[in-house]
A protein has these predicted regions:
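Non-transmembrane, aqueous-exposed alpha-helical and coiled segments at domain scale
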Residues: 1-433
């Protein structure tokens, strides 16, 4: 079985928590896009883990984890992440972690260039809100064919690889020197860095596609893990305030390494309210007062897992979520962090937009989203801790009514509802996987 777990909104929906649960019955968990520019948070009996590159399945010893061809991989960051979780007793080795030889390397200059450009824009009051992890520059160089792939690390003594490295470095020194007045990098230092990475990661680098194909053909359960959400997709998101990769489920088999395989299920993950990290239109934050937003931010601990930045917050946005569901094609829906709303007497929900007093018929990522005004419907809250609820029937009637209202607005059934951060805190409402 091939299952993709994707974000419906701007990211930070709780995909890691859902994937961790699915990994209990999975054989393989594979990331298929992005880099270390976002974090998946998983809470186990060992505490809280924040994973930037490693798939959420790494916390399950019998699961093989994969970093797929569609990713850009900061190897220095990956090494640190591996060390950090190994210190906490999590096993990481070539038997349970495989890196695609086709994945793109995030080179040392990508973070440098990202930071320099963000600083330049900030001086003009036009900062993009980049994570400064070099993701856009790594993807840009991938499509310009001016970077290395992981498989190249296995052939550093070959003339063709060394010639490419010379060509890449010459071009990059011209860019960084001409645009940002940086000192040139030396070829010898760069080659030494590559050799160091090869020494550490060579046992992990392989033809991931062949491994995944064999697993799929033998009936293994493969979970494909997305990063960020539909609103950040490079093609279908709110451009230019997007990531630099395809976050949609349709890309999952391709980015993982098995483009000929068809998904059996798409799990779309939604948070019980709206959050966003980074710049760009986000109507939900204007629906209520800043005091209300701050109360929600504190209740939900809404600070970026990768950056630590306070997340922009607001009520659940049905308009944006309907669009995200269409983009992802989800047949299963997980709603996370319902417990965060437990302290509210009334719970607002965005059910529509207006622009210049006229109702907006649908969500258009290329329209004037920064000027739309949210239309809010208010539902009664529940003054009860729901973290101990083990079944749908145990939830307060107001909590059930809230979920059912969202279902009606979205036109989709919600099968999974999380009632706390811990693994066991969830209830099932419908037929799950």
């Amino acid at each position: 079985m091939l299952t993709a777990v994707t974000g419906i909104n701007w990211g930070d929906e709780g995909k890691g928590r859902v994937i961790d649960l699915l990994a209990e019955h999975a054989d393989v968990v594979a990331r298929y896009q992005g880099g270390n520019n976002a974090g998946h948070t998983v809470v186990t009996e060992q505490g809280k883990f924040i994973l930037n590159l490693l798939p959420s399945g790494i916390l399950h010893p019998d699961v093989v984890c994969v970093l797929g061809a569609g990713m850009v991989i900061d190897l220095d960051h990956l090494a640190g992440e591996m060390d950090a979780i190994e210190e906490r007793g999590v096993k990481v080795g070539s038997e349970n972690l495989k890196l695609s030889d086709k994945a793109t390397i995030s080179m040392p200059w990508h973070k440098v260039q990202d930071g320099l450009e963000e600083d330049r824009l900030a001086q003009k009051g036009a900062a993009f809100g980049s994570t400064r992890r070099g993701i856009a520059y790594a993807y840009s160089d991938k499509y310009r064919k001016k970077t290395l792939r992981l498989g190249d690390l296995l052939h550093l003594d070959e003339k063709r690889v060394q010639d490419r490295l010379h060509m890449i470095l010459e071009s990059k020194n011209l860019e960084l020197g001409g645009c940002y007045h940086q000192e040139p990098m030396s070829y010898d230092a760069l080659l030494e860095w590559c050799r160091m990475q090869a020494g550490q990661f060579a046992p992990y680098i392989c033809d991931v596609g062949a491994f995944l194909q064999q697993a799929h053909d033998s009936g293994k359960h493969i979970v494909l893990e997305a990063q960020l959400g539909a609103m950040r997709d490079i093609d279908y998101g709110i451009f230019p305030f997007t990531s630099s990769s395809n976050t949609l489920a349709a890309y999952a088999p391709l980015g993982a390494g098995i483009p000929n395989c068809r998904l059996d299920h798409v799990v779309g993950v939604l948070k019980a309210y709206s959050t966003c990290v980074g710049a760009g239109p986000f109507a939900a934050e204007n629906a209520m007062s800043e005091d209300w937003n701050e109360q929600l931010r504190k209740a939900g601990g809404e600070y970026g897992a990768a950056t630590g930045r306070p997340r922009r917050v607001g009520p659940f946005d049905c308009v944006a979520s309907r669009y995200g569901l269409t983009c992802q094609g989800a047949d299963k829906i997980a709603l996370t962090k319902l417990d965060v709303l437990s302290s509210m007497k009334e719970i607002p929900v965005i059910t529509g937009y207006t622009l210049d007093g006229v109702q907006v018929p649908s969500f258009d990522p290329l329209s004037d989203l920064d000027r739309v005004k949210p239309v809010v419907t208010t539902l009664p809250g529940w003054n009860k801790d729901i973290s101990g609820c083990k079944s749908w029937d145990e939830l307060p009637k107001e909590a059930k009514a809230y979920v059912e209202f969202l279902e009606k607005q979205l036109g989709h059934e919600i099968q999974f509802v999380s009632t706390g951060a811990e693994r066991e805190k969830f209830v099932l409402k419908g037929e799950w996987l």
